[in-house]
């Protein structure tokens, strides 16, 4: 039994089947990239895995239990960052981290922002930051979270090369410590092929 399992997932949109019979099992320490063409259902699959949407058939299980039976404990173990940064634009970068991690002290939040490349921008309202900087505010949570499972939809959008490298290193560290990372990205990952497992939505049912 793996930590996260997709079992015979079916997803249909507008009378079109995005994927069917999709099954896979993820274990501690895995780093997974969901691949497929535009419109293949990559974001849809991520939302199914987070529990934000329900499949038309099939099940998602966490530690052997369907998500709807373990929703609270699952979400305590999950960090989800979607296409939108999901941050409070009227708050500063530092205030945003305090909002999402109320048990984190200021020093930890400042360190997370520095790791994300936002040193010097901590006290600026988010609505005055660039798109890339706003994305970094959301991604700074990667240095604070205690969640085991990270699900990230295009995390490198609007991030420069140095930022991508830093984020990639953080993901590698997380998986080396037994965490799981699932992501979509159009950018090449600067890591050894042996470290990345790819699940293709162009070959559904055989992932």
Curated annotation (Swiss-Prot):
Domain ABC transporter: 4-207
Alphabetical UniProt keywords: ATP-binding, Cell inner membrane, Cell membrane, Cytochrome c-type biogenesis, Membrane, Nucleotide-binding, Translocase, Transport
Subcellular location: Cell inner membrane
GO biological process: cytochrome complex assembly
Record has Translocase as a keyword: yes
Domain of life: Bacteria
GO cellular component, one term: plasma membrane
Mode of membrane association: Peripheral membrane protein
EC number assigned by the record: 7.6.2.5
Residue numbers binding ATP: 36-43
Family: Belongs to the ABC transporter superfamily. CcmA exporter (TC 3.A.1.107) family.
Subunit structure: The complex is composed of two ATP-binding proteins (CcmA) and two transmembrane proteins (CcmB).
Function: Part of the ABC transporter complex CcmAB involved in the biogenesis of c-type cytochromes; once thought to export heme, this seems not to be the case, but its exact role is uncertain. Responsible for energy coupling to the transport system.
UniProt cross-references to PANTHER family, sorted A to Z: ABC TRANSPORTER I FAMILY MEMBER 1
Name of the molecule in the record: Cytochrome c biogenesis ATP-binding export protein CcmA
